[in-house]
């Protein structure tokens, strides 16, 4: 009866522990930070996107203001006031003294106002393109940070697992030594292997903490949550055969196109400045009670008598600036094409390497460790061979994870050349 009670108690304890572990696992899965959620959080927290929105709004407000005619100018004053003689400082005695009120306005041409408004509209479009570029950069950085943390966790788990296995090897070596069937040097060798793995585990934990911190730079405190499953990184939205056409939508190229449009709008402003505006002024002047009041009407217009040395040069300067913007855009397009092609080629080559790791390298290192362990247990092999095989196995596993991280980072670079590119992937 007592034995039955003891067994029942142990069963209940084990059941409670299993349920607790299961509950904790379920809670972690519910609270897991998915890849797409991280992208959404990064977009919600970004102040750069708000800054670009504000820039676009400011430019559109300026465009509306630039399309309006200038405000009239009100003038008031006293003209021809005597300062000496019997009538000094008198407003009424001298027939030339007048109190004047006037209104003037520059009659700015419609084409000038339209050119200025158009320029601000192009600035607003450039800001909108800048927002798309900022979103693309944000998604790429957030994706890379999420992937970095994911694989750093996997490295830490691999090292921790190897460390646990090495601890069992210490116990086995110590038992063999105490039983007189193994040398003491095997004990020290096993302990040294554990110490090396402890150091490696500390480095892996550090790398994981740094990766979590860098992810937090983009998504805040949510970076501390456990991560969900890895997204599908086997497809990218680009294809080498149509890469040049696809890069026409690259946000940075779009920004440069809009900046080029701003430069062309500056040309129109400079050309419109070669046509002078008229200014009209109406003034009413009141004299003393013994004299007649007066009214005057004036018009004025700037005389552009050295147009070839001033206005024409300003137009030429704006044309040269627009040509510079065009040349820079074309050069940047070529650079982006080469960079994207290099990224695509590297991603494809890495995927082939990963297949070799999975099909050949990792199974071989696992089999080598198993064979060395079997030989050691049957007293036909040495502990050094086991430890060497374990080192080779962990090196291969970590190298595989590092290659996976590099490949995933390349995937993020390719996927977010354009915002949301992962939504329409092409298997390469």
Language-model region placement:
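Periplasmic alpha-helical coiled-coil/stalk elements that build and connect Gram-negative outer-membrane
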Residues: 2-3, 33, 134-249, 343-350, ...
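Acidic, low-complexity, intrinsically disordered peripheral segments
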Residues: 3-7, 26-29, 84, 399-428
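Bacterial N-terminal signal peptides
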Residues: 10-20
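Bacterial Sec-pathway N-terminal export signals of envelope proteins
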Residues: 23-85, 92, 106-107, 115, ...
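A glycine-/polar-enriched beta->alpha junction
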Residues: 40-50, 57-72, 101-118, 129-136, ...
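Transmembrane beta-strands of outer-membrane beta-barrel pores
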Residues: 78-84, 107, 284-288, 301-305, ...
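Residues that define the transmembrane beta-barrel architecture of outer-membrane proteins
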Residues: 95-99, 291-295
């Amino acid at each position: 009866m007592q034995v039955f009670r003891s067994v029942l108690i142990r069963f209940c304890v084990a059941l409670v522990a299993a349920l607790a572990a299961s509950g904790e696992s379920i809670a972690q899965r519910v609270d897991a930070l998915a890849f797409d959620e991280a992208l959404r959080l990064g977009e919600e927290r970004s102040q750069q996107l708000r800054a670009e929105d504000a820039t676009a709004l400011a430019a559109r407000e300026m465009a509306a203001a630039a399309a309006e005619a200038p405000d009239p100018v009100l003038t008031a004053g006293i003209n021809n006031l005597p300062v000496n003689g019997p009538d000094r400082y008198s407003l009424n005695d001298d027939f030339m003294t007048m109190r004047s009120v006037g209104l003037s306005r520059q009659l700015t041409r419609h084409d000038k106002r339209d050119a200025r408004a158009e320029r601000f509209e192009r600035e607003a479009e450039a800001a909108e393109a800048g927002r798309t570029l900022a979103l693309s950069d944000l998604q790429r950085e957030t994706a890379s940070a999420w992937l970095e943390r994911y694989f750093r966790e996997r490295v830490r788990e691999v090292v921790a697992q190897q460390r646990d296995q090495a601890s069992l090897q210490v116990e086995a070596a110590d038992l063999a030594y105490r039983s007189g069937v193994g040398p003491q040097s095997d004990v020290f060798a096993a302990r040294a292997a554990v110490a090396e793995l402890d150091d490696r585990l500390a480095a892996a934990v550090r790398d994981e903490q740094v990766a979590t911190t860098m992810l937090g730079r983009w998504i805040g405190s949510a970076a501390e949550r456990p991560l969900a499953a890895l997204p599908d990184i086997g497809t990218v939205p680009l294809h080498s055969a149509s890469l040049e056409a696809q890069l026409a939508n690259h946000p940075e190229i779009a920004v440069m196109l809009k900046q080029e449009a701003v430069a062309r709008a500056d040309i129109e402003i400079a050309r419109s400045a070669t046509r002078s505006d008229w200014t009209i002024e109406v003034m009413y002047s009141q004299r003393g009670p013994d004299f007649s009041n007066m009214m005057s009407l004036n018009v004025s217009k700037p005389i552009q008598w050295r147009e070839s040395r001033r206005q024409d040069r300003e137009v030429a300067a704006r044309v040269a600036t627009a040509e510079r913007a065009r040349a820079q855009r074309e050069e940047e397009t070529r650079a982006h094409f080469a960079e994207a092609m290099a990224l695509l080629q590297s991603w494809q080559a890495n995927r082939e390497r990963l297949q070799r790791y999975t099909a050949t390298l990792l199974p071989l290192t696992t089999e080598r460790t198993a064979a060395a362990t079997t030989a050691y247990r049957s007293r036909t092999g040495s502990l050094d061979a086991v430890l060497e095989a374990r080192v080779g196995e962990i090196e291969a596993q970590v190298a595989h994870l590092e290659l996976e991280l590099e490949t995933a980072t390349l995937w993020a670079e390719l996927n977010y050349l354009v915002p949301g590119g992962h939504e329409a992937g092409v298997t390469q």
